[in-house]
């Protein structure tokens, strides 16, 4: 399981707008831009044709949107939260657990989340080397259904919610 770019910045901007947190002055413009002017990963999405086995844009939060792939595919994922790509702004603004939670549930990032079979990883690495954004492996598909966020020490990382729910 892979993602493009950095996660959680738009969610951080929403939290700032709602008066729930603040960001250091030097990161304010960046965070606001990530919410107001997200960069759609169109070129990356097109490049993934024939490589990715499933893909979705992250609009409702990584956990929520990845959950759609898992549900439709009848599989699960071990999500290594230590590998989540976090921006310097997110790291400077929140404690570690809050930053990870925001990256997992924040929404409005419009990055891509996608799965790649093992036999196509080398092809992905070649293609992604030319991208103008990061491509980060964050986990692995499992036969056991469900989303399992795991810390570096192997313990579970618990989420109170998965992300934005349009019907909740």
Question: What is each stretch, according to the model?
Answer:
Residues 1-46:
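Short, acidic (Asp/Glu-rich) active-site segment that either coordinates a divalent metal cofactor
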Residues 28-29, 50, 55-168:
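Glycine-/charge-enriched secondary-structure boundary and capping motifs
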């Amino acid at each position: 399981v892979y993602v493009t770019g950095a996660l959680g910045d738009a969610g951080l901007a929403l939290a700032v707008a709602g008066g729930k947190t603040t960001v250091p002055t030097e990161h304010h413009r960046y965070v606001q831009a990530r919410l107001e002017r997200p960069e759609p990963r169109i070129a990356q999405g097109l490049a993934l044709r024939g490589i990715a086995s499933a893909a979705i844009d992250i609009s409702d939060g990584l956990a929520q949107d990845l959950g759609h792939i898992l549900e439709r595919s009848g599989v699960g994922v071990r999500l290594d939260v230590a590998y989540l790509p976090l921006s310097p702004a997110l790291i400077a603004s929140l404690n570690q657990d809050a930053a990870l939670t925001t990256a997992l549930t924040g929404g409005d990032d419009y990055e891509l989340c996608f799965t790649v079979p093992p036999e196509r990883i080398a092809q992905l690495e070649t293609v992604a080397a030319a991208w103008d954004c990061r491509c980060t492996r964050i986990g692995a598909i499992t036969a056991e259904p469900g989303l399992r966020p795991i810390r570096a020490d192997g313990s579970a990382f618990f989420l109170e919610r998965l992300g934005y729910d349009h019907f909740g």
